A protein has these predicted regions:
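Catalytic Walker B motif of ABC-type/P-loop ATPase nucleotide-binding domains
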Residues: 167-170
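A short, flexible loop at the N-terminus of ABC-type nucleotide-binding domains that lies
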Residues: 1-4, 13-27, 77-79
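Conserved ABC ATPase "signature" region
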Residues: 120-137
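Conserved ABC ATPase signature
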Residues: 142-146, 150
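Helix-to-loop junction immediately C-terminal to a conserved catalytic motif
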Residues: 56
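Conserved catalytic motifs of ABC-family nucleotide-binding domains
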Residues: 163
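ABC ATPase NBD Q-loop/coupling interface
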Residues: 65-82
């Protein structure tokens, strides 16, 4: 797959040249492939939020560059607004940014600013609402009458209605109850499967990352600590733990079984994979 986004030797320093100078991102480099579901994980202060604000030009690099389809997004600063339509960013707790009188108007705000009108705008709004499970009868309600999870869906629909090529989600399930988290992630998985768009999911939850993404980028102290397929990353579980990061609950169980002498792959990260291995061991096989 060809990369749709490329981060090249990115550095961002806050307060440069002052006694309070601090680098939030240092010499980060990685590619994001077209149609990929990429997970980014790291502790608070690891550089996650600063990094993703560079992906659509909300922040300008101190050094390095961001390429969108091979072109530096800052090559023509006057066109940075176009980049923000192509790389949609949903902030943590986006429901706090809702402001219109109705759900419909809130979802319509972004595509209307793109120049959509009439039937084209109406289709964009209703299609985005449908993608995240908002019913037609909810479109004329005030967004402030909705539950927290429903507000989150409205905010997400407002970005989807602009039809971004890349969707960046910053802790999209933060503050939701377990049912709300799973319902929202199901909407996001359906969107990825049906539309084939590139998604970047930022989370502090290894379990959420493990269940959803194709590849993982692990950040620590403003640097990329490791990256790879989930099985490759979780195979380095001890390294993740020693770095103060977490592993999925299933991986933790597998690691403990391995320590107790069970012949099992400690990098498994799904219930199904662990079940297959345990059944294979019970039958005298090797399991995989």
């Amino acid at each position: 797959m060809e990369p749709i986004l490329q981060v090249k030797d990115l550095t961002h320093t806050y307060g440069a040249g002052t006694p309070f100078q601090r680098s939030a991102v240092e010499h980060m480099s990685f590619d994001v492939n077209e149609g990929e579901f990429l997970g980014i994980i790291g502790h608070t202060g690891s550089g996650k939020s600063t990094l993703i604000q560079h992906l659509n030009g909300l922040l300008q690099p101190t050094a390095g560059e961001i390429l969108l389809r091979g072109k530096n997004i800052w090559a023509e600063p006057k066109k940075i607004r176009e980049v923000r339509f192509k790389v949609g960013l949903v902030f943590q707790y986006p429901e706090y940014q809702l402001f219109e009188e109705t759900v419909y108007k809130d979802i319509a705000f972004g595509p209307a600013n793109q120049g959509k009108t009439g039937d084209e705008l109406d289709y964009a709004v209703r299609e985005a609402a449908k993608l995240v499970g908002i019913r037609d009868d909810q479109l004329e309600k005030s967004p402030f009458e909705l539950s927290g999870g429903q507000k989150r869906r409205v905010a997400l629909a407002g970005v989807l209605a602009m039809e971004p090529e890349v969707l960046v989600l910053d802790e999209p399930t933060a503050g939701l109850d377990p049912a709300g988290r799973e319902n929202l992630m199901a909407n996001i998985r359906d969107y990825h499967r049906n539309k084939g768009k590139t998604i970047i999911l930022v989370s502090h939850s290894m379990d959420e990352i493990a269940r959803n993404v194709d590849r993982i980028l692990v950040l620590k102290n403003a640097h990329v600590l490791m990256q790879g397929m989930p099985a490759e990353v979780f195979a380095r579980g001890e390294e993740l733990l020693s770095a103060g990061l977490d592993v999925p609950q299933i991986t933790r169980i597998a690691m403990e079984l391995k320590r107790r002498g069970v012949d099992i792959d400690p990098a498994v990260y799904t219930v199904e994979a662990l079940e297959r291995q345990l059944l294979a061991l019970r039958k005298g096989g090797t399991g995989c």
